């Protein structure tokens, strides 16, 4: 019997290679590798190079992290350094993560 695992699709909107952008990406990758290893897809979008994508997704500030799948869409704007706030803000609660680990 195969166990279906959710895949999380995330988009990180940054403005160039600024210290805030680099820090946001590094922090997010750490969270994702520790909590969601193998069950996420992350797309990094530079709004300076792709302003139309930011406009389409109504991104007004950077860094912005958006969880696209599974629904509902959730967004976090600004500092991503607080792991718990990121997980709760994206509706990715610790209990769900731990249940997945126990099912593996």
UniProtKB/Swiss-Prot annotation:
InterPro entries, A to Z: Circ_KaiB (IPR013474), KaiB-like (IPR039022), KaiB_domain (IPR011649), Thioredoxin-like_sf (IPR036249)
Claim: Cell inner membrane is one of the keywords in the record: no
Any GO BP annotation: circadian rhythm
Keyword entries, A-Z: Biological rhythms
Cysteines joined through disulfide linkages: none
SUPFAM superfamilies linked: Thioredoxin-like (SSF52833)
Top-level taxon of origin: Bacteria
Pfam families in UniProt: KaiB
Role description: Key component of the KaiABC oscillator complex, which constitutes the main circadian regulator in cyanobacteria. Complex composition changes during the circadian cycle to control KaiC phosphorylation. KaiA stimulates KaiC autophosphorylation, while KaiB sequesters KaiA, leading to KaiC autodephosphorylation. Phospho-Ser-431 KaiC accumulation triggers binding of KaiB to form the KaiB(6):KaiC(6) complex, leading to changes in output regulators CikA and SasA. KaiB switches to a thioredoxin-like fold (KaiB(fs)) when bound to KaiC.
HAMAP family, alphabetized: KaiB (MF_01835)
Subunit architecture: The KaiABC complex composition changes during the circadian cycle to control KaiC phosphorylation. Complexes KaiC(6), KaiA(2-4):KaiC(6), KaiB(6):KaiC(6) and KaiC(6):KaiB(6):KaiA(12) are among the most important forms, many form cooperatively. Undergoes a major conformational rearrangment; in the free state forms homotetramers as a dimer of dimers. When bound to the CI domain of KaiC switches to a monomeric thioredoxin-fold (KaiB(fs)). KaiB(fs) binds CikA, leading it to dephosphorylate phospho-RpaA.
Family indicated by similarity: Belongs to the KaiB family.
Domain notes: Has 2 forms, fold switches to a thioredoxin-like fold (KaiB(fs)) when bound to KaiC.
Name of this protein: Circadian clock oscillator protein KaiB
Species name: Microcystis aeruginosa (strain NIES-843 / IAM M-2473)
Protein's gene: kaiB
């Amino acid at each position: 019997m195969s166990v279906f695992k959710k895949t999380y699709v995330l988009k990180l909107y940054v403005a160039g290679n600024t210290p805030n952008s680099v820090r946001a990406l590094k922090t997010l990758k750490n969270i994702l590798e520790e909590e969601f290893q193998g069950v996420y897809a992350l797309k990094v979008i530079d709004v300076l190079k792709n302003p139309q994508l930011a406009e389409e997704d109504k991104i007004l500030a950077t860094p912005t992290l958006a969880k696209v799948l599974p629904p509902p869409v959730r967004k976090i704007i600004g500092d991503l350094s607080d792991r718990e706030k990121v997980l709760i803000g994206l509706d990715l609660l610790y209990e769900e993560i731990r249940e997945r680990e126990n099912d593996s």
